[in-house]
């Protein structure tokens, strides 16, 4: 697991965006795993700018989002399909028929979950998966106690996640308590995983992810098993790591090696 500790959220977004830009420059028909929430927004702005500047193109790209609220149509302002259109897809040269979000309005959610897995497989698997992390260590909507080898499925949201997301819904508006989410096993199948985290409120979750035990109590700890997982975090999110100075030293040496190898 590569730990990159940067000074602030803007630096985190820029570093994360550059990972995706390099991926698209290397492989124009990349399959990207995408995430929603506040953390990726600045990263998406970086990708939009790079697309407008002709540094990258999304014309051959396929995308799969991590999750979606069950019970919301894609036109609902709080659906993740709506979010992705508003924050990224409407601003880049992507073929929307190749952008996939779990169907929150599926008549048969169980069948839809298997169908989502099949689509990922048919696309050749995910080249690079973007993640955020919840205060309780959830990734996607894989809440604590989720199986570490789980696949795309229907999940019940915890009260903590419901409370965290309540700010996005108007008072009295229906807020779903169920979701469709890629499983932890699905996420681990990605060739590369990039997790972004900023703010002191994520410090406990980052501590558990990096220095804690591999456990279903912290779903993100499963990234310890991945051969190419990169955690890009700011100083606040890293504040409880006991070995953060060592992680910074490792990254400096890693960058020297990459420069020497021309990578």
From Swiss-Prot:
GO BP annotation list: carbohydrate metabolic process; glucosamine catabolic process; N-acetylglucosamine catabolic process; N-acetylneuraminate catabolic process
This protein's GO CC annotations: cytoplasm
Reactions listed under catalytic activity: alpha-D-glucosamine 6-phosphate + H2O = beta-D-fructose 6-phosphate + NH4(+)
This protein's pathway: Amino-sugar metabolism; N-acetylneuraminate degradation; D-fructose 6-phosphate from N-acetylneuraminate: step 5/5
Family: Belongs to the glucosamine/galactosamine-6-phosphate isomerase family. NagB subfamily.
PANTHER family cross-referenced by the UniProt entry: GLUCOSAMINE-6-PHOSPHATE ISOMERASE
Identification of the protein by name: Glucosamine-6-phosphate deaminase
Organism whose genome encodes this protein: Shewanella halifaxensis (strain HAW-EB4)
Gene behind this protein: nagB
